[in-house]
């Protein structure tokens, strides 16, 4: 994998503060001695050089050089490494910004603020977050250091990784940049979605000055917003909250904002507008926040709720505060209880040997297998959040921890597809393979009846796998009904006209329904790559409008679940898929923009 270096612009003029380079991992006594010697040498050099902080002239008096206020803290941290060390070590508690080297993921000025044990625990925290349980267990055995999941360690790990890692999954020190100051150069702020905030929107512009600046907004021929700055967009939305064309745009904004800013930044802007403008706009801010809570209650994690509650407690008028508290209690704390069952589930078809340790795939009824697959798949599908589609976690490894639910569903598809192909090939003879293929085709009929396109495509992909399809002898033993079922699968997932048949079937499906994510992710990748994020330095809102339509279409069936009873033994059997063969499998590619889809038989 090639590494991509991203130039991080300094917020202060580049000014060399010395040449010492301290390693996070190098906390041995010899290294500390070298660090102290380097500091002494640097201090001597600074005192003997012209134009430094101070110098002593022939008369014995001291002269001072005026530095910009933005450099005062940098100078203080350089002169007092003991204070810097304390600052770094208490950062997870104080939440202050971190003083770190530009573009150096493994180096900081506080050389001994992290010891070997802390470093090991951070590595273990990474293994834990990535579900690398085997590696985590092994490192504990080798080092004799026990690991307990800790949210503070998690925050520390994220902060350290964000220092140098942008568009790369390389965890070693990045190469030096010729024009980069080797010393502490800038002040980094790590907000919750720092890696997504590449547009620098949080401090963009002045709300009062931007209020009527038409140069910051561009419109389509029909009058809808085409592009705008962050400030101008928010002001337009609030000023036109009850307008006829704003209802859809509010939905677009709150579903796509993670692609260009953060929830904290939006709430911060709302508080500023509430304080700066008149009562009418203040009331509209409250309406906007209510709309946000009602439509996207899951956006409000503990951190954002704390900010919102502080805003309500100290700045909002009593009447407005009452409205917001009511909607918070109703929507955020009780939203999981809003879904109610509307019908009784069918009686499960349980085999007689359900509790037997020798339970096999052949013992389970095809319809019940399809039902349990629906339960398994929907449990993954309903957890996916809109923001997971926006950060492209399926194509960028460094964002995978932000798209956990989406990736879980993709991995489920990969594992199930591989299991199907390997199960057929593991049969000893052609007759056994044909029989198993027939069972999978029967299951696919029930999946299609229940609109589970996720597992349906996995079955089609598994039996259409190159190695399975080459064994044409297994197809000649299929019944006419089974061959017709296979032909229907081919037709449904044919790639002609951009998977037109699937799109029609998905559009017309009556809920409950589960989409095949591969096609929808391909749509998102196409929209993202073929449209710029900005037009003349304005946010491209036409692009967000198209992205919103794709995401809403993908998530449209989340509110309505399947009402099948879960049979634990069958569900466990279908979840813990085990194969004896490691045949090449069809996958939703987690590392590229293109989704791998089955080929038609005619292309083989």
Swiss-Prot record:
<comment type="function">
    <text>Promotes the exchange of Ras-bound GDP by GTP. Component of the Sca1 complex, a regulator of cell motility, chemotaxis and signal relay. The Sca1 complex is recruited to the plasma membrane in a chemoattractant- and F-actin-dependent manner and is enriched at the leading edge of chemotaxing cells where it regulates F-actin dynamics and signal relay by controlling the activation of rasC and the downstream target of rapamycin complex 2 (TORC2)-Akt/protein kinase B (PKB) pathway.</text>
</comment>
<dbReference type="InterPro" id="IPR036964">
    <property type="entry name" value="RASGEF_cat_dom_sf"/>
</dbReference>
<comment type="subunit">
    <text>Component of the Sca1 complex composed of at least gefA, gefH, scaA, phr, and the protein phosphatase 2A subunits pppA and pho2B. Interacts directly with gefA and phr.</text>
</comment>
<feature type="domain" description="Ras-GEF">
    <location>
        <begin position="365"/>
        <end position="591"/>
    </location>
</feature>
<dbReference type="GO" id="GO:0030295">
    <property type="term" value="F:protein kinase activator activity"/>
</dbReference>
<dbReference type="GO" id="GO:0031152">
    <property type="term" value="P:aggregation involved in sorocarp development"/>
</dbReference>
<keyword id="KW-0472">Membrane</keyword>
<feature type="compositionally biased region" description="Low complexity">
    <location>
        <begin position="27"/>
        <end position="49"/>
    </location>
</feature>
<dbReference type="GO" id="GO:1905742">
    <property type="term" value="C:Ras guanyl-nucleotide exchange factor complex"/>
</dbReference>
<dbReference type="GO" id="GO:0043327">
    <property type="term" value="P:chemotaxis to cAMP"/>
</dbReference>
<dbReference type="InterPro" id="IPR006594">
    <property type="entry name" value="LisH"/>
</dbReference>
<feature type="domain" description="LisH">
    <location>
        <begin position="115"/>
        <end position="147"/>
    </location>
</feature>
<dbReference type="Pfam" id="PF00617">
    <property type="entry name" value="RasGEF"/>
</dbReference>
<dbReference type="GO" id="GO:0005829">
    <property type="term" value="C:cytosol"/>
</dbReference>
<dbReference type="InterPro" id="IPR001895">
    <property type="entry name" value="RASGEF_cat_dom"/>
</dbReference>
<dbReference type="GO" id="GO:0005886">
    <property type="term" value="C:plasma membrane"/>
</dbReference>
<feature type="compositionally biased region" description="Polar residues">
    <location>
        <begin position="50"/>
        <end position="61"/>
    </location>
</feature>
<dbReference type="GO" id="GO:0046579">
    <property type="term" value="P:positive regulation of Ras protein signal transduction"/>
</dbReference>
<dbReference type="InterPro" id="IPR000651">
    <property type="entry name" value="Ras-like_Gua-exchang_fac_N"/>
</dbReference>
<feature type="domain" description="N-terminal Ras-GEF">
    <location>
        <begin position="221"/>
        <end position="335"/>
    </location>
</feature>
<feature type="compositionally biased region" description="Polar residues">
    <location>
        <begin position="1"/>
        <end position="26"/>
    </location>
</feature>
<keyword id="KW-0344">Guanine-nucleotide releasing factor</keyword>
<keyword id="KW-1003">Cell membrane</keyword>
<dbReference type="GO" id="GO:0005085">
    <property type="term" value="F:guanyl-nucleotide exchange factor activity"/>
</dbReference>
<dbReference type="InterPro" id="IPR023578">
    <property type="entry name" value="Ras_GEF_dom_sf"/>
</dbReference>
<dbReference type="GO" id="GO:0007265">
    <property type="term" value="P:Ras protein signal transduction"/>
</dbReference>
<protein>
    <recommendedName>
        <fullName>Ras guanine nucleotide exchange factor H</fullName>
    </recommendedName>
</protein>
<dbReference type="Pfam" id="PF00618">
    <property type="entry name" value="RasGEF_N"/>
</dbReference>
<feature type="region of interest" description="Disordered">
    <location>
        <begin position="1"/>
        <end position="61"/>
    </location>
</feature>
<dbReference type="InterPro" id="IPR008937">
    <property type="entry name" value="Ras-like_GEF"/>
</dbReference>
């Amino acid at each position: 994998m090639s590494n991509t270096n991203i130039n991080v612009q300094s917020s202060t003029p580049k000014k060399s503060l010395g040449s010492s380079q301290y390693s996070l991992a190098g906390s041995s006594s010899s290294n500390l001695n070298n660090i102290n010697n380097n500091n002494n040498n640097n201090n001597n050099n600074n005192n003997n050089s012209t134009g430094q902080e101070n110098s002593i002239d022939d008369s014995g008096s001291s002269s001072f050089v005026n530095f910009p206020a933005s450099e005062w803290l940098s100078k203080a941290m350089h002169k007092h490494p003991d204070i810097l060390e304390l600052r770094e070590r208490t950062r997870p508690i104080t939440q202050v910004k971190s003083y770190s080297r530009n573009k150096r993921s493994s180096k900081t000025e506080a050389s001994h603020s992290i010891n070997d044990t802390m470093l090991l625990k951070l590595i273990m925290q990474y293994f834990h977050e990535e579900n690398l349980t085997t590696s985590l267990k092994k490192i504990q055995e080798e080092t004799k250091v026990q690991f307990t999941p800790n949210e503070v360690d998690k925050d520390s790990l994220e902060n350290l990784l964000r220092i140098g890692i942008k568009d790369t999954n390389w965890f070693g020190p990045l190469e030096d940049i010729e024009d980069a100051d080797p010393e502490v150069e800038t002040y980094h702020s790590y907000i919750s979605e720092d890696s997504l905030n590449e547009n620098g929107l949080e401090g963009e512009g002045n709300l009062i000055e931007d209020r009527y600046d038409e140069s910051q907004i561009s419109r389509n021929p029909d009058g809808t917003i085409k592009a705008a700055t962050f400030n101008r967009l928010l002001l337009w939305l609030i000023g036109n909250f009850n307008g006829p064309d704003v209802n859809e745009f509010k939905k677009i904004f709150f579903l796509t904002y993670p692609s260009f800013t953060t929830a904290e930044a939006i709430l911060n802007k709302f508080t500023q507008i509430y304080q700066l403008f008149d009562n009418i706009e203040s009331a509209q801010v409250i309406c906007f926040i209510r709309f946000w809570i009602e439509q996207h209650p899951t956006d409000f994690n503990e951190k954002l709720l704390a900010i919102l509650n502080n805003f309500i407690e100290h700045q909002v008028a009593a009447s407005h505060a009452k409205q917001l508290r009511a909607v918070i209690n109703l929507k955020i704390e009780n939203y999981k209880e809003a879904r109610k069952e509307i019908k009784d589930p069918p009686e499960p078809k349980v085999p007689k040997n359900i509790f037997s340790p020798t339970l096999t795939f052949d013992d389970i009824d095809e319809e019940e297998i399809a039902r349990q697959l629906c339960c398994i798949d929907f449990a993954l599908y309903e957890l996916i959040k809109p923001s997971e589609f926006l950060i492209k976690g399926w194509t960028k490894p460094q964002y995978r921890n932000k798209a956990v639910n989406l990736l879980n569903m993709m991995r489920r598809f990969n594992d199930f597809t591989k299991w199907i192909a390997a199960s057929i090939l593991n049969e000893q003879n052609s007759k056994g393979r044909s029989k198993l293929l027939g069972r999978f085709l029967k299951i696919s009929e029930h999946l299609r009846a229940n609109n589970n396109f996720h597992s349906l495509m996995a079955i089609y992909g598994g039996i259409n796998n190159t190695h399975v399809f080459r064994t044409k002898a297994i197809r000649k033993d299929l019944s006419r009904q089974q061959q017709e079922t296979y032909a229907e699968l081919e037709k449904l997932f044919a790639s002609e006209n951009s998977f037109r048949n699937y799109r029609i079937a998905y559009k017309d499906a009556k809920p409950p329904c589960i989409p095949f994510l591969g096609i929808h992710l391909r749509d998102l990748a196409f929209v993202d790559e073929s449209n710029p994020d900005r037009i003349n330095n304005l946010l491209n809102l036409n692009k967000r409008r198209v992205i919103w339509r794709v995401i809403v279409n993908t998530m449209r069936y989340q509110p309505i679940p399947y009402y099948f009873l879960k049979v634990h033994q069958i569900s466990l059997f279908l979840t813990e898929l085990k194969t004896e063969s490691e045949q090449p499998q069809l996958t939703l590619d987690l590392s590229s923009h293109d989704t791998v889809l089955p080929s038609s038989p005619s292309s083989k």
